Regions:
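Nucleotidyltransferase catalytic core that binds NTPs
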Residues: 1-152
């Protein structure tokens, strides 16, 4: 489902994004499970709901949520953020040096050369598809092309 922070963005459908995740993660490890919990839920897609579901299913696991620094700056606005930060750690890719509340505990990852946001990447798919292709697993890029996703 679409994030409540991105209500008006043109997005792939929920099922299309799920399919892209399946393509992307199947090559990493057969132990990775891509869940459709949020797609099947009738309630809004809040991260806290998904985290609670995962912890109920896998009570022994430790969860981390990987975000870009742009979302790090918005964390305090996330639904039930106070409860969420007690359940997970946040790993934040440092990108554009957004102002992040110093009270929020983030594990920063620097120097990974991800100087592009997801919105900028979707724009790149239109402006320079060959460059965008170099940034994706071939199966994911082919899926995007075959389904005419993110075209302006």
């Amino acid at each position: 489902k679409q994030s409540s922070n991105k209500v008006n963005e043109t997005m792939a459908s929920s099922n299309q994004r799920f399919q892209m995740c399946l393509h992307a993660f199947q090559i990493i490890s057969p132990k990775i499970e891509v869940s459709n919990f949020e797609l099947n839920s009738s309630s809004p897609s809040y991260t806290i709901n998904t985290v609670r579901w995962i912890l109920n299913k896998f009570p022994e696991c430790e969860l981390s949520i990987i975000i870009g620094e742009d979302q790090g700056a918005l964390l305090a606005t996330w639904h039930e953020f106070e409860a969420l930060q007690k359940l997970v750690s946040f790993i934040c890719f440092s990108r554009n040096h957004f102002e992040v509340n110093p009270q929020i505990q983030l594990i920063y990852i620097d120097n990974l050369n991800f100087e592009i946001s997801s919105t900028e990447f979707r724009n790149l798919l239109n402006s320079d598809p060959e460059k965008a292709k170099l940034m994706l697993h071939p199966q994911v890029f082919d899926y995007i092309q075959n389904n005419n996703l993110y075209l302006c």
